[in-house]
Amino acid sequence: MNTQFDTIPFEALDGFSCNLKHFISPNPTKGPVLLVHGAGVRSNIFNPPSQQNIIHMLADAGYDVWLENWRGSIDLAPNEWDLDQVAKNDHPAAVQKITELTGSQEVKAIIHCQGSTSFMISAALGLLPQVKVIVSNAVSLHPVIPKFSVFKLNVLLPIVGTVFNYLDPSWGIEAPDTKSKVIRKVVQATHWEKDTTVGKMVSFTYGAGWPALWELDNLDKKTMDWIQYEFAHVPISFFRHIRNCVKNGVLVPSGNGETHYEVTPMQTDARIVLFGGVKNKCFLAESQVRTFNYLEKEKPGFHKLYLMEKYSHLDIFFGKNAHVDVFPLMINELDKG
């Protein structure tokens, strides 16, 4: 990230060191909006090499833009986290820090993937009373994945978990040891799509597609090159947790399938706007449909669902036409309050 950002450290409620990135913008006319990244990436995932990325468009629309590096960020020390830890410790502390620094009592949020699942747990448990609008991409409370991904979680994960504590798509650039080189060889032998080796490693790690997290037609060359440096370590502990959630069809506490986070009523008055890429092969769009149906039963007509026909998972944020197809919709929903 360049000098357009200030870095503000904060401690999660359990003492883990995280940070916020604050986009430097003269005299924002609207309140703070927090962007929350997914697993195995960092806040810079919202900052692709385009002047029309979501950060700049939010700032141009008058928002005070903040980005959270929670404990799953590759900018922070590797650690074996699960969604419960993030939900109960990281997001509440980040939102509290923003309200302290800005003086605003309300925050809006744009959240993605495991930043989204963990943030939604926080909201459901009433830990984010300051957050009034949540724009969630890809998955929220009800993870639904392709059948091959179910196979990988149930059959391959137990095997991989005996050898690795982390997987790391950056092995596509440099694999540090024999076992990581073996993984890279397997990926190169089974992924023939015209993506970078890191991009192929991403698809192997997170989904069931060639590629899984974006449509290649949605990316320009500059963005494809940039992606290679935006993925790194993700712990096996996360995959074990999400496997339990997928099995139950709803987010559940780590190691416990008897309770779940489909709280009724949810302990938040936030309006929730869901985005799902129809071509997503990491979390199927059905994930967001199920969460919307749950929200609609709880408060009919209050929440919103967008299914984006041309998009997958992360190209929602760094697709070459996202500034035309996606960001105006998100900003409009934030403006509605």
Locate predicted features.
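Alpha/beta-hydrolase-fold enzymes
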Residues: 100, 104, 117-249, 253
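Short, surface-exposed "cap/lid" segments of acyl-processing enzymes
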Residues: 19-75
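Conserved alpha/beta-hydrolase "acid-adjacent" motif
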Residues: 281-287
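Alpha/beta-hydrolase fold nucleophile elbow
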Residues: 92, 101-114
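Catalytic active-site module of serine/aspartate enzymes centered on a nucleophile-bearing elbow/loop
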Residues: 292, 298-337
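Short beta-strand/loop motif that positions the catalytic acidic residue
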Residues: 268, 274-276, 280
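Alpha/beta-hydrolase active-site loop
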Residues: 81-101
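N-terminal cap/lid segment of alpha/beta-hydrolase-fold proteins
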Residues: 1-25
